[in-house]
């Protein structure tokens, strides 16, 4: 059994040291086109079309899913200015406020359209159409600046995002409250699970699945009044044993970081890249092009 209670400062340290980023190898391309096979005209830059999860029909094979062009998915953590106490590794996960705002403006000006997980699932599993230049924005770890900085900036451009919540943090200083999570959900953002306290899924045994997955999922369902269908692995770490555990608990898909997708279960190993605090808008562009 894993230890179920660890201080939040240790959680943060684990995150900074264990998450895997792609920030050191950026392509030099200036291209802005990242287009899966999608023909639906979007209603305008930055907006997504509300699409329910498709549950009927034959789901594509793993090979068919892997053959579809990948949609760029960005993973953010903290949106704030660096401080003297932030280490070199930690800064990779802290995007300065002005830079985040510039990145959102760049995405909007470039005609990117945010999509949500139901749309991505329908595209991967059933070949459903997507808007032009789709992109998904995700935020991990429940930090308060996601509410105070990110949400207003998303609203400015009509963007919607996915917030993966670590429920141990709800209501603590500098973290999101249940009411804020509820308001984000009501505004059209998607709330996903990020475990109870950010423990490594590869170490789960027995009751850990209840403590880290079932109870936090129930908490988020109670907060939002909605089913919780999407999961992000802490540190991006996963193993094959975790996938059936997530499936039997009702998840539709799960998200890793930049490593290769599983050839048998690509819906439960959807790739994301960390938006590094060291990147400007051009390097973010180039990383999107290179990574997807």
Model-predicted regions and their roles:
Residues 151-159, 176-193:
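Acidic (Asp/Glu)-rich catalytic clusters
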Residues 137-138, 191:
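Residue-level marker for buried hydrophobic side chains located in beta-strands
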Residues 26-137, 144-145, 203-292:
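C-terminal active-site subregion of NodB/CE4 polysaccharide deacetylases
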């Amino acid at each position: 059994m894993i230890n179920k209670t660890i201080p939040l400062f240790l959680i943060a340290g684990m995150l900074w040291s264990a998450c895997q980023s792609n920030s050191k190898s950026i392509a030099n391309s200036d291209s802005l086109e990242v287009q899966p096979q999608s023909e639906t005209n979007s209603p305008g830059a930055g907006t997504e079309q509300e699409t329910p999860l498709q549950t009927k029909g034959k789901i594509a094979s793993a090979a068919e899913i892997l053959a579809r062009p990948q949609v760029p998915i960005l993973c953010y953590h903290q949106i704030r200015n660096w401080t003297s106490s932030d280490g070199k590794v930690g800064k990779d996960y802290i995007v300065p406020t002005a830079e985040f705002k510039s990145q959102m403006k760049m995405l909007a000006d470039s005609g990117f359209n945010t999509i949500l997980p139901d749309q991505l699932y329908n595209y991967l599993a059933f070949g459903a159409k997507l808007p032009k230049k789709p992109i998904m924005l995700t935020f991990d770890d429940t930090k308060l600046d996601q509410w105070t900085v990110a949400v207003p900036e998303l609203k400015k451009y009509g963007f919607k995002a996915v917030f993966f919540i670590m429920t141990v943090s709800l209501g603590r200083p500098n973290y999101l409250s249940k009411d804020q999570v509820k308001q984000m959900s009501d505004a059209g953002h998607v709330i996903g699970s990020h475990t109870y306290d950010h423990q490594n899924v590869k170490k789960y045994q027995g009751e850990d699945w209840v403590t880290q997955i079932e109870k936090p999922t129930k908490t988020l369902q109670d907060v939002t009044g909605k089913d919780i269908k999407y999961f992000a692995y802490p540190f991006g770490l996963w193993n094959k044993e975790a996938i059936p555990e997530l499936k039997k608990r009702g998840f539709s898909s799960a998200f890793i970081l930049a490593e290769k997708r599983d050839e048998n279960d690509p819906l439960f190993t959807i790739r994301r890249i960390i938006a590094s605090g060291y990147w400007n808008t051009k390097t973010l562009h180039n990383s999107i092009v290179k990574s997807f």
